Amino acid sequence: MLLYMSLGGVLVGFVSTWFTFKYFPFAEYLTPLLHDDTLAGIGFIQCRILLPLIVSLLLAARNGAIIAADLGYRVNRKQIRAMQNLGIPHRIYLQTTILAALVISGLLMTVMSLGISAWVSMETWSLLFPDDSLHIWRESFFSSLTRGDGLLPQGTGWVLAKVVGSAAAIGFAGLYFGLAEKKSVIDINRGIAQSIVTSVSLLLVIHTAVSLIEF
C-alpha cells in the first residue's frame, strides 16, 4: 500500500513539474516573468486537487476491491450468519472498523503522498533550473498554501472533505456490495466489480462537487 501510494506521489510530482516547465509556451520570454506564479500554481494544483484525487482513486481501486472480496467470502461461507448466531456485534466488529480504517488510512496516505510529491517536484525543478537556489522553490511552491494567519495550510478543510468523503463512499460501497447475498464465486467477483465502479463514481462526484463549491 505504501509503495502504491508513493508511486502516485512520484508521478504527480514529476509530471506536473516537468511538463509544465519543459513545454512552457514561449519559455525563453515568459519563464522569467511567470516562473514564480507558475511554481505556486503547481503547488496549489498538486496539494488541493491532484493528490487528493489520486489517493482517493487508488484507495477505491485497491481497498474497495479488498473489502468487497473479503466480505463477499465471509457471506458466501456463512461467517456473517455465524457471527449473528453467536451474538457477536458484526456491525461494530466489521463495518465500523472498516470505515474508520479507511478514513484514517486515507488521511495518512494523503499526507505521505503530498510530502513525496513535493519532494519529487523540488528535485525535478532543481534539474530544470540547476543554477537557482532551492529557497526560490520553497518560497514559491508553498506560497498559495500559506497565505493567511491560520495554523493549518490554506484549504485544509476542503482537502479533508474530499478525502474523508471519498473514503466513506468507498467504505459504504464495499460494505453494501460485499455484504449482499453470495451464492457462488461469480457473485463475489460481481460484487468486487460493482464496488469498484460505484466507489470510483461516487468519489469523482464528491471531488467535483467540493471543488465547485470551493472555487
Pin down the residues of each PLM region:
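Membrane-interfacial helix-loop-helix connectors in multipass membrane proteins
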Residues: 18-47, 112-164, 172-191, 214
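Hydrophobic alpha-helical transmembrane segments of multi-pass membrane transport/permease proteins
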Residues: 2-24, 199-209
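Short cytoplasmic-facing helical segments at TM-TM junctions of multi-pass membrane proteins
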Residues: 71-95, 185-188
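Selective recognition of hydrophobic, aromatic-rich stretches within alpha-helical transmembrane segments
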Residues: 58, 62, 160-168
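Hydrophobic alpha-helical transmembrane segments of multi-pass membrane transport proteins
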Residues: 38-81
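Bilayer-spanning, highly hydrophobic alpha-helical transmembrane segments
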Residues: 103, 107-120, 167-173, 201-209
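Selective transmembrane-helix segments that form parts of the transport pathway or gating/packing helices
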Residues: 2-6, 50, 54, 63, ...
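Juxtamembrane boundary at the C-terminal end of a transmembrane helix
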Residues: 209-215
